[in-house]
Amino acid sequence: MSAQQQKDIKWAGSSKEDLLSFPREARHEAGFQLGQVQLGLEPDNWKPFNGIGAGTKEIRIRDKDGIYRVLYVAKFEEAIYVLHCFQKKTESTAQADKEIAKARYQAISKR
């Protein structure tokens, strides 16, 4: 994919502000990984994220300050949608974070 063919990133809800609140290292890593997705590549550390909507993926970031997640979907032709960005504080993803991402996915799907 050439630079002209990069997909735009669209931020759902407060996802951009949430990402900008990450510590510097985690924020830069998230930006780099989203750049990979824009180029049509896979992020370095990701997995499918079930229960939100078809095609939802999770970028996994770990730094000295904690564990961070960026939930996104790249299956739509027009853009990559960042659904939710958050710091993970427990072994499993909090239900509130899942509900935020699911509501944003549903809003995007209805467009």
Residue ranges and their predicted role:
Residues M1-I67, F76-A79, Q87-R111:
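Basic, Lys/Arg-enriched alpha-helical interface segments
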Residues V73:
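Short hydrophobic/aromatic beta-strand micro-patches
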